[in-house]
Structure formats: C-alpha cells, structure tokens
Amino acid sequence: MMPERFSFDFRPIDQYWTRAKGACSNTKRGNMYILASLALILLHLLVLPIYLYLTWHHKYWRKRGLVTARPLTLLGTYPGLLTRKSNLVFDVQKIYDKYKGKHRAVGVFVTRQPQILVLDPELAHEVLVSNFRCYKDSLQSSYLRHAKWDKYARLNPFWASGQSWRRLRTDAQAGISGSRLRQAYNIWEQGGQMLTEYMTQQVAEKNNILETRDLCFRYTAHVMADFIWGIDAGTLTRPMEQPNKVQEMASKWTSYAFYMLTLFMATIVAPCSRLLLRFRFYPKETDEFFSNLTKESIELRLKAGDSTRTDYLSHLLQLRDQKQATHDDLVGHALTVMLDGYDTSGTALLHALYYLAENPAVQQKLRVEILSCMASEKSLDFEKLSSLQYLEQVIYESLRLSSLIPQYTKVCTLPTVIRLSESKSLDVEVGMTIMIPNYQFHHDKQYFPEPEAFKPERFDNGAYQELMRKGIFLPFSDGPRICMGVPLAMLTLKSALVHILSNFQVVRGRDRLIPKGDSGFGVVLQGDVNLEYRRFFR
C-alpha cells in the first residue's frame, strides 16, 4: 500500500506573494515619480538661469521711470525681427496705437536691447534738430565705424559716423546743389524726352499696358548714369529683352543693401556676430563694377578734353584736383548720389504714378497745371518746373502715404535728458538707441484726417514746412543729417511726371493694389505694377 502523498496548502503564501509583488510595483512606480520630480527640478534649475538672463532686464525702463511696452521673453517688443512673420512697421503700430497721446515716449526692447520709441512728433524734432548734437549717429553708422572692409558704405554720409559724416556730406552735396542742378538740367530734359519716346514705342507694342516698376527704374538708371558718369546706360534705347549692365548692377546693389539692413536689425540679439561674420552693406561684385565704371568714365572725360559739361563727374574731378580726393573717395561719392537718385527716386516715382492712376481727378488737376505752364511750348525750363506747386503737393502726398523709410533710429552720442512730462524726465546714456516712427506719424488721423486717402491739398500753402517743423512729416528725415539728395530726387520726380502726364493718361487696372509689408521695414507696392498708358497728342 502506497503512503499517502504529502500535500501543502500554498494559498496563504500566494496571498502574501501577490501583496509583495504589488508592493514592489508600487515601489518602482514611486521611484519613477521621484526620478521624474528630480528631473523636473533639475530642468527648472537649468532653465531658470536662462529665463532670468532673458527677462531680468525687463525692469530696465521701469527703474528709470519710463513706461514699458511689455516685451516677449526672447523676441522682445518686435517679434517680427526674428520670426520674420510680420513687418517691423506693424509691430511698431501696435505699440504706437496703445500708448500715443498718453506718453511722449515708451521703453521697448529690440530682442534684449533696450530702446526708446518716440510717440510725440515734437520729441522727434528735438532728437533730429534742436538737440542733434546728442544724437549724431545712426544705428548703422555705429557699426560701420568698425567695418573697415565695407569701404564704400563707410564713405556714404548716410552711414558715416563720428565727425567724418560732415566732411563727406559737404564734399558730396556740393555736386548736387540747386545751382549745379540748374546748370545740368538739360540731362533731365533730354532724359524725359527719351522716356516719352520709349513709352510711345512700348505702348504700341504692348496694348498700352506697361509694367511700371521696370519703367521707373529704367528712367532713373538713365538720368543717374548720364549725370554721375556721363554715359548713356541704354535703358531707354535698347530693347527690353537686352540685359543692361548698369541697371542690373544698380538693382543688385540696392537690393542687397536693403536686405542687409533687415538682417542687421535681426542680429541685434548678438551684435558681435556682425563683425565676426564681416557683414557688409555693399556686395563686392558691385563695388568692383562701380569702381571700374568711375575710373573709365574719368579717363574718357579727360581724353575727350571736355571741360564745359556740368554734371557730377565734373564735380568729382574738381574734388580730385582741388582736395586731393582718392579714387575710393570718388567712388563713394558717386554711389551716395546713385543711391538717392536711382532706387529711392525710382520707388517714389512708381508710387506717385500708381496713386495718380487711382485718383483720376487729382491726375487731371495736375495735368491742367502742367499744360497751362507749358502753354505753346513742348517743355519746361528749370524755373517753370520748380514753380509747379500742385506737382510738389502730389509728390509730398505720395511720399506721405508710401513712407519709403518708415522709421529712423538714432544713437545717443552725448549724455542728455528727455522731458517726459512737467514733473518727470529721463536720463539718456551714450549708446542708447531712439526710434522715430515716421510711418505712424504720416498715417495718424490726428495729423492727417482720412490718412489713407490721397489728398495732395493737405500740403497747400506751404504746409510742408510747418509739418516738418513740428516733426510730423519726415519723408527725408530732418536736421543736419536730413537726406542731402532732396533737390536731386525732387528734380528727378518732377521731370518724369511732367513728361509722362503731358503725353499720357495713366489708368489703373481692374484690381486695386494694396501696399504690403514683407518681412522687412517698409510697406510698399509689391511685385509687378501694370498700369495702362493712353497716349494723347497736344
């Protein structure tokens, strides 16, 4: 008989084992929670110094008694500069709308850099004119002082720093004085006639529709090449399909310069990177081209022995002979005038023609003024052109609406004080930047009722001078560093508009074009601008 098999009841042990497994599982879970908590604490310890570094300066203006426009942690007050999703004009507009009328200025941050945003036009006038000695430099000039590799940009008075800008401005400006432009007026008169002939040929071939951006830059390239270097650029004589070197290089040069201005602002979070990366506003290729063009033009003029022609090239020769100006000095002066006369004048002409096409009543009123002054003549002399008051008003109103340079940024060069109110003032330290938002002034209904309407009559009876004196209207800036090319630009715009409107009616297409802001600074017409030009005969 087999012995009975021994059996043991494990159920109590299983019960304890299950509990033990549960306890072990809970222990693991608890350890995970502890590790996660430690990781979060460590992350906070790592992030906190970064956060404090990015935000500790946000009290900068509050400590100094200036109201602060709340900045974002990393992006500052103008996030579009880094994200590239909005235009600087729109970022400034939000702050301007919130604080204008309440404060003369507010504190802002360009990424991490503190800056003063002017909201009161009278304060803008103080910075640009009455207290200019404390704000001599611009943001770009403070950089170019060290960028010795960008030699021609450094020779432009617009970007020059310290005391050099005054000498450069004096030498460059003497060649575009009112008396000198009067003597050289035939260049613009002949250029206007060539423009009319070119347009007549083009409208016949293209069913009256012309891409106006190209048209405007062809004209400014022609008159600037003739005036500065004494050459025919061929922009109004060669077929459109043939490439033109002067216009091609001028467009490449100015496009690069304005792109670098945008990039320059975007890198303000790390200013040292500009010098490390050797930022330059003028590309090497165009530097070489315009250097050779200046050299060859001087050689041709000397070889021809023509000392009677009054233009900018003859002025450059005088600087070389009388002031021992170097070749680089001459190229720098030539490019200074080219920048004013080619790109900014071409863009201003484009917008003026579009606004006239959009406002036929204004266009007709201007045409009547032009034709009445011409009487039986087919052209206007310099004095008659200068006497056209409504033409000048049209140009000013176009410049107000387009605001090609929407803001000016000045740098404090001497310690000074800004009066914020009757009882409060702000000490401004050397190196502090101050932005003047002239686009916002130009589009403020407090100063310009119906600001988006095109009304040249706003500038009737010399209102232009009064608005400038109050710091409200600043298309050319103001003060000692006001754009020196104003007479040149006005002559170029007036001559072109007179020749176009005395021979063509400008008509807008079906769709209205709206100036847009890309990721840069301005709010201007983008892409092709196709307008209809209907020829009529007087």
Swiss-Prot record:
Keywords assigned by UniProt, alphabetized: Endoplasmic reticulum, Heme, Iron, Membrane, Metal-binding, Microsome, Monooxygenase, Oxidoreductase
Any GO molecular function: monooxygenase activity
InterPro entries documented for this protein: Cyt_P450, Cyt_P450_CS, Cyt_P450_E_grp-I, Cyt_P450_sf, Insect_CytP450_Detox
Keyword Transport on entry: no
Broad EC category: oxidoreductase
Subcellular location: Endoplasmic reticulum membrane; Microsome membrane
Cellular component GO terms held in the UniProt record: endoplasmic reticulum membrane
Highest rank taxon of the organism: Eukaryota
Residues annotated to bind heme: 483
CDD domains: CYP6-like (cd11056)
Keyword Transcription: no
Chief location of this protein within or outside the cell: endoplasmic reticulum
E.C. number: 1.14.-.-
Cofactor requirements of the protein: heme
PROSITE patterns in UniProt: CYTOCHROME_P450 (PS00086)
Main function: May be involved in the metabolism of insect hormones and in the breakdown of synthetic insecticides.
Family assignment from sequence similarity: Belongs to the cytochrome P450 family.
Protein name: Probable cytochrome P450 309a2
Organism field: Drosophila melanogaster (Fruit fly)
Species lineage: Eukaryota, Metazoa, Ecdysozoa, Arthropoda, Hexapoda
